Amino acid sequence: MVKIKAAVCHEFGTPLKIETIDLREPITGEVEVTLGAVAVCHSDISFADGDWGGELPAVYGHEAAGFISKIGDSVKGFEIGDRVVVTLIKSCGYCNNCSEGNPTICEDNSNAEPPILSMKGNTIQQVMNCGAFAEKVVVDQSQIVKLNNDLNFATASLLACGVITGIGAVVNAAKLRPGQDVVVIGAGGVGLNAIQGARIAGARRIVAVDTNGDKLTIAKEFGATDGVLATEKSPWRIAKSLVGRGADIVFVTVGNSSVYDIAPRYLGYGGKVVMVGMPKTGDKSVYEPVMMAAVSQGMIGSKMGDVIIKRDIPWIVDLYEQGRLKLDELVSKTWTLDQINEAIADTKLGSAKRNVIVFEAKQAS
């Protein structure tokens, strides 16, 4: 066991507490990663607020980067000192979905011995297989991707969730074709990356929709051709007038069920809604199936951009190195672990692209 600092949730909807906890050694197939940075994602906030349930106490955080500091047995392709991105995508490699190239929806829910414990020896939940609001994590080797460049950890951490979720939703889930028109509802961290993905994939028009005018301005910097305030009366009509028709694809990147109610109104004939943002457990949306079926419209879900991390993350990094993709600009502000509750409060205001917690991780030379 090694002692580490972590931000622990003991009660939903209350500030996280910085505590010293125990982290066990990595076992077969696992690695210990000393973290350099972890981003604050709205999913972490939803869990901490109790929107999706779960057991407590718990450590959240799933969008991280650092270097490997210990390696368990049977780990292949990684060495101590390797700089890596740490994701929540734990895959067995053998179930039907993994065998078909869909590791984000791996069917194997079995878990190893819990890696984190309180100082009294009680189990602490490692949420989303990461628990990265901490100085170190122990994760499965399937969750990490090696970084072969000197990308700083704050920027690299975003590759673990927001970037791959947005870009992957466009390229992998929607399979956008050059010349298609898209609407992206929500111009936050994931939405901006959906916009970047649409630009890279060759979309003709990219319409960003958000309640915040400043975020629409930022969306255009990331590749949106147009912006529509969601507070306007019938914003879907404005979007259609800008495009000249309904959209081929609408990406919903916010976790609000009322947004899902109106998302199909942006569609053209044969279009589809891609569900990316996740509302609270139990929230419902209402549709008119006859209207969608009559014009061959549809809806699909996209978890973590349907990515294969060892394929997609290196590709995305290469685009960044070529200057074709913005990553550094996604970091709104950096914070320390002791400031995590302030970072969460700032994220809840809705103006940040991504707040990132940085650690003083010192890698042996």
Q: PLM features: residue spans?
A:
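C-terminal hydrophobic helical "lid"/dimerization subdomain
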Residues: 1-4, 237, 249, 261-265, ...
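Glycine-rich cofactor phosphate-binding loops and adjacent beta1-alpha1 units
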Residues: 174-178, 190, 201, 213-298, ...
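NAD(P)H dinucleotide-binding glycine-rich loop of Rossmann-like/cofactor-binding domains
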Residues: 23, 92-185
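Residues in the short beta-alpha loop(s) of Rossmann-like NAD(P)-binding domains
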Residues: 12, 212, 279, 305
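Residues located in well-ordered beta-strands
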Residues: 5, 17, 22, 34, ...
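Glycine-rich beta-strand-centered segment in the early N-terminal region that forms part
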Residues: 24-38, 48-99, 104, 128, ...
